């Protein structure tokens, strides 16, 4: 969007929120936050009736994106962790219609903190230990969230512990083949190996973030202030999140410290203690 069109969108957003929350906001500014694969994300600054400014995060569905996800799933996943020890933004509203602002969207309050590049091995220096402990502890808390009261569990189709890996593998194989412009021999070889070497059934069904890693959380000093990007959340095997967060993709320059935080053994110990889940190493590798 050009600057003028973006400012018009910001004013329309202000008008919408004023009506929705029954208070008068004044539009101050709007800025695009780049980097997401599935949403247009904006920071919108508004002034309330008491002349106090407040930043809102406005996540808007795109016509095309690298990853096709349902915005309601993202919103509901956030809702499962409101006012818990898993730090997430406070939700304001989900609008599933395109009638209001031209596309479905969700609105959240902005959290303090910054997001680091997942490829910067010094991003968390000198607080790798403190941030690392929180990072793996929070992932354990996500895995241990009770599904009985989970809104996400009520929203999504039921899974069972025996078919978690098959359903996820089939989903991503379909995405890869749909988006490929031709045969991908290396990917097809990897797919065949994954089908041949399926892991054990999940020891527990849990909320799975879907993209839990460095680069997808906010931090300020030595504190993790927010877990972001829940658009791929689902119910499944918690080892999926654990394996992805441990992946050498996110620590290729210092492979002994996953996510460029703390040593692997220490990370696994924190996660296991918090989640109370016994992990099978072969399944984790898968």
What do the PLM-derived regions correspond to, one by one?
Residues 278-286:
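All-alpha amphipathic helical-bundle segments outside canonical DNA-binding/catalytic cores
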Residues 228-233:
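Activation of the activation-loop gatekeeper triad in protein kinase-fold domains
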Residues 25-31:
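Conserved N-terminal boundary motif of the eukaryotic protein kinase catalytic domain
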Residues 207-209, 214:
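Catalytic-loop of the protein kinase fold
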Residues 240-278:
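Active-site activation/catalytic loop segments of kinase-like enzymes and analogous catalytic loops
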Residues 31-189, 193, 197-206:
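ATP-binding pocket architecture of kinase catalytic cores
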Residues 1-25:
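Juxta-kinase regulatory segment immediately upstream of eukaryotic protein kinase catalytic domains
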């Amino acid at each position: 969007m050009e600057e003028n069109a973006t400012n018009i969108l910001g004013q329309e957003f202000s008008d919408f929120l004023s009506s929705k929350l029954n208070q008068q906001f004044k539009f101050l500014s709007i800025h695009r936050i780049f980097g997401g694969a599935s949403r247009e994300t904006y920071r919108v600054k508004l002034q309330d009736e008491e002349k106090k400014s407040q930043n809102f995060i406005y996540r808007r569905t795109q016509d095309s994106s690298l990853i096709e996800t349902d915005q309601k799933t993202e919103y509901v996943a956030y809702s499962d962790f409101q006012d818990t020890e898993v730090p997430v933004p406070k939700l304001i509203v989900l609008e599933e219609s395109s009638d209001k602002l031209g596309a479905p969207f969700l609105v959240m309050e902005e959290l303090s903190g910054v997001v680091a590049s997942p490829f910067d091995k010094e991003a968390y220096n000198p607080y790798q230990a403190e941030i690392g402990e929180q990072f793996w502890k929070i992932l354990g808390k996500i895995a241990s969230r009770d599904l009985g009261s989970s809104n996400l569990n009520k929203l999504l189709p039921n899974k069972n512990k025996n078919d978690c890996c098959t359903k996820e593998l089939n989903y991503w194989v379909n995405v890869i083949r749909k988006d490929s412009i031709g045969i991908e021999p290396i990917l097809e070889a990897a797919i065949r190996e994954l089908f041949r070497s399926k892991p054990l059934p999940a020891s527990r069904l849990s909320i799975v973030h879907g993209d839990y890693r460095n680069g997808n959380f906010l931090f300020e000093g030595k504190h993790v202030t927010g877990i972001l990007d829940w658009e791929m959340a689902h119910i499944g095997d918690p080892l999926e999140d654990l394996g992805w967060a441990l992946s050498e993709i996110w620590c290729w320059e210092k492979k002994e410290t996953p996510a460029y935080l703390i040593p692997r053994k220490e990370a696994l110990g924190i996660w296991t203690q918090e989640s109370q889940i016994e992990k099978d190493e072969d399944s984790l590798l898968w």
